[in-house]
């Protein structure tokens, strides 16, 4: 046994003799421990719905065999650990069996249907927690049970568990399935949760303080179940005692994990260094294989792409030629049909045109004959007209002379009457000589006149009053008679001449109308003369009517011509125009169309010339760009790689230069950040190293001094305080927190003078390290710190530190934070170091790019420009081809439009005639009017001269000269009546004139004399005028005779001319044609027009016949060309389709494998096929050598040499790519692209080599530090076990008076610790070896210092990992103090059954308490977990032992559930009497609960 074990024994002896250790800290607030309140069983065997209220200390189930005690405990255990892999409820019938029943003892305890086992607990927070399981038998031979765990929270205290899990159905109750239970609480405050894993269920129970330890794995659950099982069946469990270390000693996962992390980091570091060396050797191979395979495949790839593009272009050209031939053939066939149709139409129209031409020629001859007759007629008509004019002039002159004769005769008669009247007046006025005589005479004459008037008028009552009325009456009669007499005088005055005129007029009338009665001559003459006026008017209109008829006939002919032209136009234009508006609109449209077509045609010609120039320019630009494109693509590839490396999109050369400058700045900043992070990482490593020490001290001299003084660091004594208490104790001791606790200060004082190396301030505290308390200070805790009363006059206030030194939990918590921060800083440092390397590499690439490709990289894409140029060129070619077709089409449209306009120009002037539907009627009407007018004209020509002669003498026909005597008698009678009436008028007027004479009788005599003289003068004048009138009458009569003779000569000449004219008119009437102005021109124009049309038709027919022959020959040629073009196109298309299938496979392979951008090297597209084959062949030779050692790549390369399957080359490239990708070390290079991997290798290799070398030095584990950590951990756990022993001091069962745990360090491991601490130089070969890990070195050292131990088949690594666990250094045993034997190892064979049960229960209580302490850091501060153990068959304990258990439960605040026979009735706790009964064939357990009667 080592010194350490002896020290432990001494400490144990001292502990037994010392008082109990005071608590480490007095908590300010007491937290109550959680308790199990009840157990509810639903539908179990004997328990349909039973709730057992659990006592706060001991609950006893009392009953006979088969009463249901084990069933109740099984329900509790099942609800606590619902793991079917662990549950195994044994009974006494299986005492000697090696295996239990299939159902693990659970199937038979359940009834059919839904069953529940539910635990109700009340935790430290006062929360009601309901946890349980739903069980259900599964039908089958295996007797399986289905278990579902669940929990309920926020259930009111008033709700019982049974009411929750069942519902009342009439007088019976129904157990709710789990789904209905869930639905029952949906939408309510009650939280129902079903668990699909046991780990989640136990995590919930741990968080709420139902179980003492977090059960993270099945191993933890197994330990917990074994603990329960050992408690249930009692005794000292060998399973637990043999593995007591696993139950009592917590696993120091932090330390072991730290060792493992360091070791794995070192291992990974060394592996990475090896991988770097391998990668360095792979880099050249990567470059060579990638370069050659890329050249080999991409050259063939681009050659196939070029050939495919060329084949497609050839196919397109052949298809275009095929379509052009097809369209030409269709066009020629259409022309053949149109020309054939036109020839047929011309043949049909030719015969009708010939007939029309002959008819027009005959009509022209008739018109010319008619015109010759018309000229003669016009000449005779002119002569007759001149003679008629002369006759009319002579007749007018004769009439004027006749009028002069009549006027002269009337003047002579008037002159005679005036002379006679003046003579009678003068005779009357000679009778008055003087005035009186005259007055008297006048008076007498007035009276006489009045009497005379009375006598003449027969008016005896005549007087001065009514004389005027009678005068007016007789004056009117005198006027009528005067007119009558004047007429008769006129008739009588011309009676001699009238007789001659009558005879002549009668003769003329008889010539015109034939023989008629003389008495009817006047009426006939008057009617002839009346009609003659209209006839002359009609005769004058004959010329106009003839012109009008000619115009109408011309217009009618034009209308017929227009209808014919319109029909031809509609036929040619495929229209149905009828109205003028439609034709005019179409004319304007066609005229506009003609202008547009002409403008468009001119524009086409100009544009075509411009396009040809553009095509030449584009060809020059294309050739220039084609020369530049390969270099541009190379620059673009470099730019793409540069942008991919930089992660930046460069838009211009300035951006590249700016990025270079930014990269330099970024490199400087990254270097500074890297150095700063390196310093931070070193500081964190130092801090982590310090906190990783067991005592948390940053001064190693304190540990040495503590060992020298035989004391313990104060921080080690408080290493087990909780996270919450650690700040308090750190503040409580202040600067003395680094003190050393020694047993005797006086013994240490002597050694202080001998110290040569110690801290500036060294604090020493006297006390027992194994029983130390904090009674040194008087302290008061505040909100943010602690006030410590050092003395009456000195207080110290210390704030709670953020990182307390005390408490392993607090240090580990902060250590986790520091490690996370260290890892983060380390990662940042690696990132910054990588950034520095990357910046340097990028700057190098940027410099190369600027020097080589900058001038071209940012130029516009020549391929895009070439595509644009090619598109423009293609577009220009297409436009030129289309322009040629369009030009031909436009010229055709132009000719068509011109022809249409030419026809429309002929039609439009006649368009008004088309709508004149009355033209034919008006022509007929005009022809009828012309016939009438010509008849009148003929009548005027024949009888106009007679009527002209008749007109002036027609009045002579009124009186026949044979009645002259009667006329003369009538004249005399009228004269006598006139004279008589004049006498009466004269007598009355004389009375009226003499009215004044009745009033006076005298007058002045001088007046009469003057009147006489006046009358004499007037008489002389009248006589002179009479002589003059007689002379004028004689002259007029002589002139009348002369004019009459001239008129007779002219009339005879006119009659001869008129007779000749009538003969000519009859001849022209026989011809049936009217010759007028323009008739010959119209007839000749009509004939010439028909002749021209006939000539044009014949010429057109001859041209069409020639064209038909040419077109038929052209159709034959085009048919042969079309067949050949179709065959060539289909052949080429099959070639394209075959190439497309292969090309699609190539594209599919390249795109699916993401290698298309590697193969599609556009700079190779401008090289010829021979050049590309040369590149591919050179690369093939290099690849054959490169892949000679790789069978897979060699076979793939051999398959790729088949030129008929280009996809095999892509498959080879993919194989190479995949092969290289698999060779990439992902732990070094973060990419799967071999191209990028090469680039990243350049960046990573140098950085990783330096960094990993320095990292390996940092990660090196010190053997001395490992030994120190293990010693401190072992010492801490020994102290903890000593504290646990205090709880077992007063335990007594039978002869056993005490129980304790003994911890010893194994000798072999103690030797190992000494070797680690002291043999640094001796065992340097193991720990400095690069080939051995620290675990392996530790295992080799263990073997070296313990050569007698056999390692077996285990590896050094496994042994080394076990040696890093402090639990393997300790032996833990249970000892009992029994009678005279003293302390001895606890074994069942040396103890009675009751003593073994009590001892085992004590051990289990220690385990539970240890678990609580272990899990205290992971549990909430306000939670103390429930403590409950089981004990079946408690009858083997006597009353004293039972009371001891009760006392132990009370002291440890633990609940106990025991099963006892009926004769056991504890005085304390709660007892349930269970009796199984059968009623009405139904078995059930009758339960009666009793409170302990001894309880106060």
UniProtKB/Swiss-Prot annotation:
Database matches in Gene3D superfamilies: 1.20.58.850, 3.40.1140.10, Immunoglobulin FC, subunit C, MukB, hinge domain
GO biological process terms on file: cell division; chromosome condensation; chromosome segregation; DNA replication
Molecular function terms from GO: ATP binding; DNA binding
Pfam families (UniProt xref): MukB, MukB_hinge, SbcC_Walker_B
Provenance organism: Actinobacillus pleuropneumoniae serotype 5b (strain L20)
Residues covered by region (Flexible hinge): 694-811
Entry keyword annotation includes Chloroplast: no
Function recorded in the entry: Plays a central role in chromosome condensation, segregation and cell cycle progression. Functions as a homodimer, which is essential for chromosome partition. Involved in negative DNA supercoiling in vivo, and by this means organize and compact chromosomes. May achieve or facilitate chromosome segregation by condensation DNA from both sides of a centrally located replisome during cell division.
Compositionally biased tracts (Basic and acidic residues): 1082-1091
Key word Signal present: no
Protein name as it appears in the record: Chromosome partition protein MukB
A cellular-component GO term for this protein: cytoplasm
Entry's family note: Belongs to the SMC family. MukB subfamily.
């Amino acid at each position: 046994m080592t010194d350490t074990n002896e020290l432990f024994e001494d400490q144990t002896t001292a502990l037994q003799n010392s008082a109990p250790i005071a608590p480490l800290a007095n908590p300010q607030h007491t937290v109550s421990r959680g308790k199990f309140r009840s157990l509810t069983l639903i539908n179990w065997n004997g328990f349909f719905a039973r709730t057992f209220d659990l006592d706060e200390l001991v609950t006893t189930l009392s009953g006979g065999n088969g009463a249901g005690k084990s069933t109740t405990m099984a329900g509790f255990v099942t609800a606590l650990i619902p793991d079917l892999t662990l549950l195994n409820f044994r009974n006494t019938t299986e005492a000697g069996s090696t295996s239990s029943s299939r159902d693990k003892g659970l199937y038979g305890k359940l009834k059919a249907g839904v069953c529940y086992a539910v635990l109700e607990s009340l935790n430290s927070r006062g929360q009601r927690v309901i946890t349980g399981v739903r069980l259900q038998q599964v039908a089958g031979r295996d007797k399986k049970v289905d278990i579902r765990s669940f929990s309920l929270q926020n259930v009111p205290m008033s709700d019982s568990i049974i009411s929750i899990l069942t519902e009342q159905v009439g007088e019976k109750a129904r157990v709710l399935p789990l789904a209905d239970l869930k639905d029952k609480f949906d939408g309510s405050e009650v939280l129902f949760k079903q668990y699909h894993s046991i780990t989640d269920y136990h995590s919930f129970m741990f968080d709420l303080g139902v179980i003492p330890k977090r059960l993270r794995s099945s191993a933890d659950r197994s330990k917990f179940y074994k603990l329960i099982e050992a408690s249930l069946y009692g005794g000292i469990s060998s399973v637990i005692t043999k593995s007591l270390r696993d139950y009592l000693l917590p696993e120091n996962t932090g330390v072991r994990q730290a060792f493992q992390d360091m070791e794995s980091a070192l291992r990974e570091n060394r592996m990475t260094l090896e991988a770097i060396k391998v990668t360095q050797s792979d880099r050249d191979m990567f470059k060579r294989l990638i370069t050659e395979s890329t050249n080999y495949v991409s050259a063939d790839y681009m050659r196939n792409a070029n050939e495919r593009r060329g084949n497609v272009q050839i196919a397109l050209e052949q298809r275009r030629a095929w379509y052009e031939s097809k369209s030409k053939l269709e066009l020629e066939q259409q022309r053949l049909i149109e020309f054939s149709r036109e020839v047929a139409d011309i043949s049909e129209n030719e015969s009708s045109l010939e007939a029309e031409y002959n008819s027009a020629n005959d009509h022209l001859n008739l018109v010319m004959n008619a015109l010759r007759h018309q000229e003669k007629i016009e000449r005779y008509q002119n002569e007759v007209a001149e003679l008629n004019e002369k006759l009319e002039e002579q007749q007018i002159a004769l009439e004027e002379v006749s009028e002069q004769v009549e006027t002269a005769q009337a003047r002579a008669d008037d002159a005679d009457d005036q002379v006679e009247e003046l003579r009678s007046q003068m005779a009357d006025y000679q009778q008055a000589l003087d005035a009186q005589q005259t007055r008297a005479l006048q008076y007498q004459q007035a009276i006489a006149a009045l009497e005379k008037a009375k006598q003449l008028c027969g008016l005896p009552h005549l007087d001065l009053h009514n004389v005027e009325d009678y005068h007016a009456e007789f004056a009117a009669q005198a006027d009528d008679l005067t007119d009558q007499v004047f007429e008769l005088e006129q008739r009588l005055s011309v009676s001699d001449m009238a007789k001659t005129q009558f005879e002549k007029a009668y003769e003329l009338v008889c010539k015109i109308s034939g023989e008629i009665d003389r008495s009817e001559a006047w009426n006939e003459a008057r009617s002839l003369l009346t009609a003659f006026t209209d006839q002359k008017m009609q005769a004058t209109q004959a010329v106009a009517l003839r012109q009008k008829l000619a115009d109408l006939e011309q217009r009618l002919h034009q209308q017929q011509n227009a209808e014919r032209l319109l029909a031809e136009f509609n036929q040619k234009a495929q229209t149905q125009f009828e109205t003028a508006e439609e034709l005019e609109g179409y004319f304007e449209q066609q005229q506009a169309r003609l202008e547009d077509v002409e403008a468009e045609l001119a524009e086409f010609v100009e544009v075509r010339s411009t396009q040809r120039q553009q095509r030449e320019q584009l060809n020059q630009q294309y050739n220039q760009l084609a020369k530049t494109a390969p270099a541009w693509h190379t620059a673009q590839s470099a730019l793409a790689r540069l942008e991919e490396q930089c992660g930046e999109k460069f838009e211009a050369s300035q951006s590249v230069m700016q990025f270079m400058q930014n990269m330099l700045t970024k490199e400087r900043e990254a270097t500074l950040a890297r150095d700063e992070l390196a310093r931070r990482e070193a500081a964190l490593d130092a801090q982590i190293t310090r906190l990783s020490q067991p005592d948390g001290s940053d001064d190693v001299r304190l540990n040495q001094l503590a060992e020298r003084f035989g004391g313990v660091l104060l921080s080690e004594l408080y290493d087990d305080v909780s996270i919450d208490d650690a700040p308090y104790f750190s503040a409580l001791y202040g600067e003395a927190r680094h003190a050393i606790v020694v047993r005797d200060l006086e013994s240490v004082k002597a050694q202080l003078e001998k110290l040569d190396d110690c801290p500036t301030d060294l604090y020493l505290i006297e006390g027992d390290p194994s029983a130390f308390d904090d009674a040194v200070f008087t302290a008061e805790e505040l909100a943010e710190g602690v006030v410590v009363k050092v003395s009456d006059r000195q207080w110290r206030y210390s704030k709670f530190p953020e990182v307390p030194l005390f408490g392993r939990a607090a240090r580990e918590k902060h250590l986790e934070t520091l490690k996370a921060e260290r890892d983060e800083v380390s990662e940042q440092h690696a990132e910054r170091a990588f950034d520095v390397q990357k910046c340097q590499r990028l700057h190098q690439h940027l410099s190369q790019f600027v020097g080589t490709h900058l001038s071209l990289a940012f130029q516009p894409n020549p391929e895009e420009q070439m595509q644009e140029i090619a598109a423009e060129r293609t577009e220009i070619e297409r436009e030129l081809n289309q322009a040629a077709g369009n030009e031909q089409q436009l010229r055709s449209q132009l000719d068509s439009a011109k022809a249409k306009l030419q026809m429309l120009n002929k039609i439009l002037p006649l368009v008004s005639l088309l709508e004149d539907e009355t033209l034919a009627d008006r022509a007929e009407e005009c022809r009828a009017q012309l016939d009438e007018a010509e008849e009148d004209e003929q009548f005027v020509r024949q009888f106009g001269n007679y009527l002209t002669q008749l007109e002036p003498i027609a009045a002579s026909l009124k009186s026949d000269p044979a009645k002259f005597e009667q006329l003369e008698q009538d004249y005399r009678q009228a004269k006598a009546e006139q004279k008589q009436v004049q006498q009466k008028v004269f007598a009355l007027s004389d009375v009226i004139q003499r009215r004044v004479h009745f009033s006076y009788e005298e007058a002045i005599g001088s007046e009469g004399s003057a009147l006489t003289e006046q009358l004499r003068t007037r008489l002389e004048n009248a006589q002179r005028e009479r002589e003059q009138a007689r002379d004028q009458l004689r002259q007029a009569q002589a002139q009348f005779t002369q004019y009459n003779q001239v008129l007779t000569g002219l009339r005879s000449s006119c009659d001869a001319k008129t007779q000749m004219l009538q003969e000519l008119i009859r001849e022209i009437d026989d011809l049936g044609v009217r010759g007028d102005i323009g008739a010959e021109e119209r007839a000749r124009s009509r004939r010439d027009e028909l002749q021209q049309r006939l000539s044009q038709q014949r010429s057109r027919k001859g041209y069409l016949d020639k064209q038909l022959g040419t077109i038929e020959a052209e159709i034959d040629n085009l048919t042969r060309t079309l067949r050949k073009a179709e065959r060539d196109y289909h052949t080429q298309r099959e070639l394209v389709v075959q190439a497309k299938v292969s090309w699609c496979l190539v594209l599919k392979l390249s795109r699916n494998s993401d290698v298309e951008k590697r193969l599609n090297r556009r700079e190779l597209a401008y090289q010829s096929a021979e050049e590309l084959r040369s590149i591919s062949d050179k690369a093939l030779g290099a690849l054959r050598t490169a892949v000679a050692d790789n069978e897979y790549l060699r076979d793939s390369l051999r398959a790729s040499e088949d030129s008929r399957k280009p996809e095999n080359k892509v498959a080879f490239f993919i194989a190479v790519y995949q092969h290289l990708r698999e060779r990439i070390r992902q732990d070094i290079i973060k990419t799967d692209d071999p191209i990028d991997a090469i680039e990243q290798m350049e960046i990573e290799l140098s950085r990783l080599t330096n960094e990993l070398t320095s990292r390996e030095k940092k990660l090196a584990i010190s053997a001395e530090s490992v030994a120190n950590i293990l010693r401190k951990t072992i010492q801490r756990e020994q102290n903890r076990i000593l504290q646990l022993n205090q709880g077992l001091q007063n335990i007594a069962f039978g002869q056993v008076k005490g129980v304790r745990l003994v911890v010893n360090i194994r000798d072999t491991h103690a030797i190992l610790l000494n070797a680690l601490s002291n043999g640094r130089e001796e065992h340097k070969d193991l720990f400095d070896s690069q080939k051995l890990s620290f675990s392996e070195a530790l295992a080799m050292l263990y073997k070296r210092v313990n050569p007698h131990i056999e390692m077996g088949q285990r590896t050094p690594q496994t042994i080394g990992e076990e040696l890093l666990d402090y639990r393997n250094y300790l032996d833990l045993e249970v000892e009992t103090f029994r009678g005279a034997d003293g302390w001895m190892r606890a074994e069942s064979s040396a103890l009675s059954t009751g003593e073994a049960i009590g001892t085992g229960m004590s051990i289990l209580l220690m385990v539970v308490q240890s678990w609580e302490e272990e899990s205290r850091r992971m549990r909430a501060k306000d939670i103390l977990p429930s403590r409950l153990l089981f004990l079946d068959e408690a009858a083997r304990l006597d009353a004293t032992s039972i009371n001891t258990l009760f006392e132990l439960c009370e002291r440890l605040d633990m609940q106990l559930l025991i099963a006892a026979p009926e004769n056991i009735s504890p005085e304390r706790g709660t007892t349930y009497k269970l009796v199984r009964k059968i009623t009405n064939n139904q078995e059930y357990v009758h339960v009666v609960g009793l409170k302990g009667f001894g309880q106060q």
